[in-house]
Regions:
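Anion (oxyanion) recognition and catalysis
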Residues: 13, 64-65, 115, 136, ...
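Glycine-rich phosphate-binding active-site loops on the catalytic face of alpha/beta enzymes
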Residues: 38-39, 43-48, 125, 142-153, ...
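Short, charged N-terminal beta->alpha structural module
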Residues: 2-10
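Catalytic cores of alpha/beta
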Residues: 26-34, 82-86, 110, 128-138, ...
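C-terminal alpha-helical cap/extension of soluble enzyme domains
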Residues: 24, 168-207
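Glycine-rich beta-to-alpha transition loops that act as phosphate-gripper elements at the mouths
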Residues: 20-25, 77-81, 101-105, 123-130, ...
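Histidine/lysine/aspartate-rich catalytic loop segments that bind and position anionic ligands
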Residues: 126-160, 164
Length: 207
């Protein structure tokens, strides 16, 4: 999916910060028609939700059946080559699929390679402003600062969102800031207040 495609256009064309959901296909079916921007997965929930479907591929097919919105697929690998190979398997399934890759040296290299191909990407496990700056320069389109894990160790869950919003400002080519691991309505409120462009949460919090 091209960088200037569906997901990247949502912030400009939409009515405010976009809301993305996590959950199983059956859990999300009810909520997707209510203006939800897309579905976001991670490796933990993929393994959990895939069991009833028999495989991750079958699970992704089930997500694609319930929505025509983007489905963000987290991938992992021990090398840049493995990340690109795994990513290709999923992006060839549907134009709706967008890749999410953890922040790492291999991730930086994968983002740069995918940028040259016009493939839209999300960067997860972002815990510092310097990481956000580095992956932005590598070409990532969506940066996911983690909120609740910071709160659990006594920190400000949305500080990094504020810092990213200030750093990127109104730069035309800046990545979108997605508040991630948002487990309470209070944290969602703070993330919107502090400038996130997007937010992903479980359907139970959205409800």
């Amino acid at each position: 999916m091209a960088v200037n495609g569906t997901a990247a256009d949502l912030r400009v064309a939409g009515r405010g910060p976009t809301i993305w959901l996590a959950g199983s296909p059956d859990e999300l079916r009810e909520w997707m028609p209510l203006g939800i921007a897309g579905i976001v997965t991670n490796t933990v929930v993929l393994n959990q939700y895939a069991k009833p479907y028999g495989s991750v591929i079958k699970l992704i097919e089930a997500y694609l059946e319930i929505t025509d919105k983007p489905v963000v697929m987290e991938i992992d690998g021990h090398s840049v080559e493995e990340l690109l190979e795994v990513g290709k398997v999923f992006t060839e399934m549907s134009d709706q699929i967008i890749l999410k890759i953890p922040c790492s040296v291999n991730g930086l290299k994968a983002f740069a390679a995918l940028k040259t191909e016009g493939v839209e990407t999300f960067c997860t496990t972002v815990f510092s402003l310097t990481q956000a700056a580095a992956v932005a320069q590598a070409g990532v389109d969506h940066i996911l600062p983690f909120c609740e894990p910071v709160k659990e160790v006594g920190g400000d869950p949305t500080r990094l969102i504020r810092e990213c919003a200030q750093m990127f400002g109104d730069r035309q080519q800046r990545p979108l800031i997605m508040a991630a691991l948002v487990r309470t309505v209070e944290t969602a409120h703070a993330a919107f207040r502090d400038g996130c462009d997007e937010l992903v949460t479980m359907w139970t919090v959205y409800r």
